Amino acid sequence: MKLFDTKPKSDPHFLYGREKELELLVRYLKQNDWIILLGPRRIGKTSLAKCAITRLGYKSITIDARENNNFEESLLKSLKHHEGSFNIRAEVKAPHLPVNLGVDYNRKSSAENLSVMLKKAGRLIVLVDEAQWLHNPRRVNMLLSYIYDTYYDKITFVITGSMIGVMKSIVDPGARSPLYGRAITKMEIERWGSSVSIGFLKSGTKEVGLEMNDQIGLTIEEKLDGLPGWLTLFGYNYAHIKNPNAALTETIKEAKKVVSREMKNIGDLGIGLERITEILQDLAKEPMRFTDLLDSTGFSNAVLSRHIDTLERLGYIEKDHRDEYLISDPILAAYINENP
């Protein structure tokens, strides 16, 4: 079961529906370009990045900001374990590395530690996954700026995430940002259309010895909003349950749990979960114009604009041709309706 494997893909043969994006990303990386992959969760950013790295055959390390939101610590530990980078044992100090990597280190020595390790790393791609959850944006940008200026010819970053938290400061650095003026290429990864989604479901079900007709495929695509991660999860469940309706029910149940965790993460970031939730509750009832949301929420123009911007960057809402905002993810809408 390859297409319906729920882990991020690393073999380009099983990266469905992203051929153009893969070729573009590979071309950028060959040029040593630093890349930012933007898009909502479950869109396939990690798989795209890993497959591009595989295609090139470069060595790589991965930092998952969901597991550790301290960028310095994660980068140093990943480099320490990178094969051929710097061969030391945990809890042992090495010459010219004035810090014990098994415990805390101080900021003054971090640049020296990185310098020693990066010099030994060789040609390397660093994948920073879901970077919006990293803390201390300025410190992250300082380290990225240092690596960019010093090791651009050998160290390349691929950074994935949605446009919240530290990602916003990386994508749109202000004039006072350490990253200001550095050339970093942005790629936005979009949802699949119906034809691609149904084609994926048909190919995946054929692989596991099951069938999928267009009508059922279209229903699943609409319920799961063309997000590859949700469609893959459906396929995984379908391969085990054998019943498409039961598999869809189970997938939606699991997807709502993921949304719940995302909402908690938004709260942990301190970017206004209560007000964001209030906006989503209104939009879960019906699409609304900005002026209608002003009336229903009672927020000031500036406050509403700020939170609308956050929701758009998260990929949670969008504006339609009637200039009305609506929740773009049906899973999110269902979750909001069930958790008023």
Q: What is the meaning of each model-derived region?
A:
Residues K7-S10, K253-L269:
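Short, Lys/Arg-enriched N-terminal segment that forms or immediately precedes the first helix
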Residues W133-L134, Y146-R176:
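Sensor-1/coupling segment of RecA-like P-loop NTPase cores
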Residues I266, G272-P340:
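C-terminal leucine-rich, beta-strand-based interaction scaffolds used for sensing/assembly
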